């Protein structure tokens, strides 16, 4: 019999929020009797935007903004129906994007 696996990818701009969410997911899965591997930190994606400060001239005066996207990966091996129900009822912050693959 093949092992079932749930793979959860989390994305957020704030690393504290994503770590709290990952901890909640791991704790919930372990409490329901499933094996958990993770959270595994994935590489942080960094986007840099450069804009000209002035409206009409002064091209040498520029400002840079950056946006960092933190990512985590959690694998839940051999999930029970109780695990799936517990994960569906979990309340996570709005700043976290969740992708679930079965």
Curated annotation (Swiss-Prot):
Signal sequence, start to end: none
Record flagged with keyword Nucleotide-binding: no
Taxonomic superkingdom: Bacteria
Biological processes per GO annotation: translation
InterPro entries: Ribosomal_uS10, Ribosomal_uS10_CS, Ribosomal_uS10_dom, Ribosomal_uS10_dom_sf
Molecular functions per Gene Ontology: structural constituent of ribosome; tRNA binding
Cellular compartments per GO CC: ribonucleoprotein complex; ribosome
Sorted UniProt keywords: Ribonucleoprotein, Ribosomal protein
Record's subunit section: Part of the 30S ribosomal subunit.
Function: Involved in the binding of tRNA to the ribosomes.
Similarity comment text for this entry: Belongs to the universal ribosomal protein uS10 family.
This protein's name: Small ribosomal subunit protein uS10
Gene: rpsJ
């Amino acid at each position: 019999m093949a092992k079932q696996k749930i793979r959860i990818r989390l994305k957020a701009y704030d690393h504290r929020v994503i770590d709290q969410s990952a901890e909640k997911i791991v704790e919930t899965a372990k409490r329901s009797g499933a094996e958990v591997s993770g959270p595994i930190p994935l590489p942080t994606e960094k986007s840099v935007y450069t804009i000209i400060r002035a409206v009409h001239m002064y091209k040498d005066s520029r400002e840079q903004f950056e946006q960092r996207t933190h990512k985590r990966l959690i694998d839940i091996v051999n999930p029970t129906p109780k695990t799936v129900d517990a994960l569906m009822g979990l309340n996570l912050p709005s700043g976290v994007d969740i992708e679930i693959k079965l």
